[in-house]
Amino acid sequence: MTPSEARDQICATGLSLHQRGYVHATAGNLSVRLDDGSFLITPTDACLGTLQPERLAHVGADGVQTSGDRASKTLALHRRIYAADPQARCVLHTHATHLVALTLAGVWQAQDIVPPITPYYVMKVGHVPLAPYRRPGDPATADWVHDTLAASVAAGRPLRAVMLDRLGPVVWHRSPAEASAVLEELEETARLWLLIGRNVAPLSAAQIDELRQAFGAVW
């Protein structure tokens, strides 16, 4: 997509997420990698519901900002995800309510914050590990996510999301629309898991294998 199209998609995605309650106040950030290796990212402390295309931060492939308002404090995290996964063209971070609540109540496993309880979770989201708590913007978080993602790519099972303990999910995909779809499925699964009291059996290995065979699910 062109830089102009990317700016418009970032603003439209931010507005949609804000209107539907996936982000609040100035929480969350969003970026798109452009064809030349540079990327656009939302400004620090910006409300995703009121983004303006011309105020988005443009950052070169070298990490140097060239225009726009000051880039999000999670700039390093976005850059490290793009470095680890060549297929990633959009990174999205929110403070989604049920996912944050899940980290406070206790996740299923460190390597899978919720179990595979629905077929669409397996097909659209996949494994979501829990990143240890660190302050927002801590470079150590970016390093952890990069190393975890790089290992999954090398193993042939690339991740689409990680969960930052007490902060929120980080998801990535080929476009803002696809990243948003992953976020929504992940948040909905966390909501279901909490709603039922976290006491339902996950899909069986045979059921998950059927999803692999029928739909190419990566699990």
Indicate where each model-derived feature is located.
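Glycine-rich flexible loops
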Residues: 1-219
